[in-house]
Amino acid sequence: AIYGHDDPLNVIPDNVSSYPKWGELTLDVSSVNIIDIDNPPGCSVGADICVYEVEYTTIVDLNNNNGIANGGFHVTHERCCRNNSIENISDPGGTGMTYYAWIPPIFFNNTSPEFTNSPLPFICSGDTTTALNTATDVDGDELIFSYVTPLKGNFTAANPPQNINPSDYPETYSIPIAEVQYGPGYSYESPFGAGGYYSVVASNGLTTYYSNIQGKFVVGVLIKEYREVNGQILLYGVTTREVQLIVQNC
């Protein structure tokens, strides 16, 4: 669903605010491909493991809709639920996931940044791994990368169901979106637990992982897109990526 944002000076509020539904959209599957796994050195997986890349596309004609989108558009899709075996969040099998982006107002001409590579699916336990979660922007905007807590969403596990329809989304939606709850021993600062490490270089998205615990983990990356307009630095877009990593003995 798409929700209108009426305040161009406060795109991602510190306190929870509700925004009206601008409209609904249905995305069509445009391509399905098996991609090569770019594992770190010494990390191998069985021949029966496949990673699929699925692309969804649609065209939407955005408009201001009587002023409700003076501050842009929040695009969100929620899905239930996660793998029961994820180590670092509470009740993963009952926790949803949310795909989110913010598009600037219609009087801003903009192209969102595109990630240059697929996320790394596997890392080796007890070994430091670096990976690129970088992106390019055809407009030449400044991109600032950071790691964030993955998004749970504003629904419960049973609402929406797995086969959610666009019309199931409520007439108002809360921003910031609710985040996952970390399990005991894990946190935003330590998503891999005690002794683990996770960092993202703000200028280029270079990401470093380290975990001495094996299992499945989820982490998040956020891109904020800035542009100078008439001497002012303005936020022009927000893009998120969530990564599920399998930490294994190599």
Question: Model-predicted segments: where are they?
Answer:
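Long, compositionally biased, intrinsically disordered segments
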Residues: A1-C250
